Amino acid sequence: MGSSRAPWMGRVGGHGMMALLLAGLLLPGTLAKSIGTFSDPCKDPMRITSPNDPCLTGKGDSSGFSSYSGSSSSGSSISSARSSGGGSSGSSSGSSIAQGGSAGSFKPGTGYSQVSYSSGSGSSLQGASGSSQLGSSSSHSGSSGSHSGSSSSHSSSSSSFQFSSSSFQVGNGSALPTNDNSYRGILNPSQPGQSSSSSQTFGVSSSGQSVSSNQRPCSSDIPDSPCSGGPIVSHSGPYIPSSHSVSGGQRPVVVVVDQHGSGAPGVVQGPPCSNGGLPGKPCPPITSVDKSYGGYEVVGGSSDSYLVPGMTYSKGKIYPVGYFTKENPVKGSPGVPSFAAGPPISEGKYFSSNPIIPSQSAASSAIAFQPVGTGGVQLCGGGSTGSKGPCSPSSSRVPSSSSISSSSGLPYHPCGSASQSPCSPPGTGSFSSSSSSQSSGKIILQPCGSKSSSSGHPCMSVSSLTLTGGPDGSPHPDPSAGAKPCGSSSAGKIPCRSIRDILAQVKPLGPQLADPEVFLPQGELLDSP
């Protein structure tokens, strides 16, 4: 019996060994792709990317997470799943809005697709990258009178917002996974009067917000359109005028908050905010995140009457670019950081590179800004030809008579117009405040860290209006905010208070971080008070 059993065991053992050998050959090509995602640091979804990250500079494996969104026939249940295929260039992630499962919750590890927040009657979400859409084209979103499509569609509701062809670009492959029973949202108020939407709606607030993520090649004849090669992001709403934009390849200005629900209609049920807050409402801003995540600080505010560089406005609150929570810190996939402000940078450096273009909306005063660089505000070079001066985007509709004048007395002109050279001449480096009267409601802040005035970099004059909140939350000039004169240093630095010090004078304010150095440009010392 033993002799008859041995060959059978041998055959089984042989088959078993063969199976093991085959598995050993197949595993590296199949399971290793998913296992390697976490063994390879470049594929680790918990990895934090930085500007000189070898995974971004081509020294590491650039393949990362892409995700797909499934769409039901009614567009009411959109699920997200993770796929380890391909790089980010051809994937649909980032331009897909995903809702995890029928319970409406996002779970870490289930997918790394863009998660957006929308709320109110007639508001909806659309992800249109040419390869994946949320919802079917035959479904309509409530009372907004809009239909879904791969590009923008129009809405008759004046309270809805547009994030479509000329408005907002969501980074490809952005990821915002959250804890169980809650979802991470992106609040993006944009231009009123239009809505690019499908039928996927959920959220808390009452004003319609629509988010569309359109990715397409850049076009020179559409200067303000978002594109895959470096978007120009327009950001406006009931308060912020259309001249508020970020360009020059900057990532979109977005606000990320955790949403929790407790019985409100259409709200995902979830745990209460870790730092307080009303049920069913956005959690209050977290004070800060670890320095390893870029040292971002949340400087909150409850007034809708002011905005400063690097901050964005949504639903009556002001948040900084790149806002995220400590419980769900920023995550990224190779080549595609998940937070909207781009790789971790000093907030002070970001602020100082964004001169402010005051403009005025119909309702109240506003601050608009663009970064110095390719697109946006540019400075005239000394004697160089073809350099554009400071200008406002052609879509801003800000008349030159009401915009800031340079120290030479020449007003700003729309970018691309015949007059492209008005700028602050080298050696002056300050804007004239003559056209920035208080009566016009314009607000000017002094960007700290500007280099020497001889290089033509702008800084605001000592008479510029710094902010303080009035009883009604409206901005008022406050000389005590601490801005110092520009150009008073012989070392080529502009001694001025950091943006955090200025913000500290603005009331009401949210939590403050005790380390203002994260708001200073790299290599610059903090002024002693």
From Swiss-Prot:
Where in the sequence does UniProt note compositional bias of the Polar residues kind? 449-467
Biological processes annotated in GO: cell-cell adhesion; skin morphogenesis
Report the subcellular localization: Secreted
Q: Is Secreted tagged as a keyword?
A: yes
Q: Please give the InterPro entries that the UniProt record associates with this protein.
A: Corneodesmosin
* GO molecular-function term, one example from the UniProt record: protein homodimerization activity
For this UniProt record, the keywords arranged alphabetically read as follows: Glycoprotein, Secreted, Signal
What residue spans carry the Low complexity bias annotation? 58-83, 90-100, 111-175, 189-231, 392-408, 426-441
- Tell me which domain of life the UniProt entry assigns to the organism this sequence originates from: Eukaryota
List the glycosylation sites: N172
Region named Disordered: 38-248, 383-492
* Signal peptide (UniProt feature, chain positions): 1-32
| Gene Ontology cellular-component terms listed | extracellular region
Show the PANTHER family listed in the entry: CORNEODESMOSIN
Q: What does this protein do?
A: Important for the epidermal barrier integrity.
Protein name (database record): Corneodesmosin
Organism per entry? Pan troglodytes
